[in-house]
Amino acid sequence: PVPAVASDTTHRNEHGGERQTFVIDVDGVVASLVPDNDYAMAEPLEGTIAAINRLHAAGHRIIMFTARGSATGIDWSTVTRDQFARWGLHYHELHFGKPAGDYYVDDRLISIAALQALA
């Protein structure tokens, strides 16, 4: 079962189940980490993309959230959208502006392995 989330993010999906919202990072999750943050060189992480696509197909809401460009001011939006299209990633929203950090601490964290097990 998908872990419980706050009621303001849980809705019914078209399959009759609860639609949950997954907010998913980009680099290191669906895109490979690359030297010097040259994101145009990133490769797809196909196992995670397949898991996300299964969640999307099951009616869950997928929001991609990235720190691409947050530290440098470079606009990576076209590169990122083109990559997602080329890689076949299914999502509902893409958000930039995640603060660049060394670590993120979150009370709703699930690992990539747990995400893949859910899908």
PLM region spans:
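HAD-like aspartate-dependent phosphatase fold
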Residues: 1-119
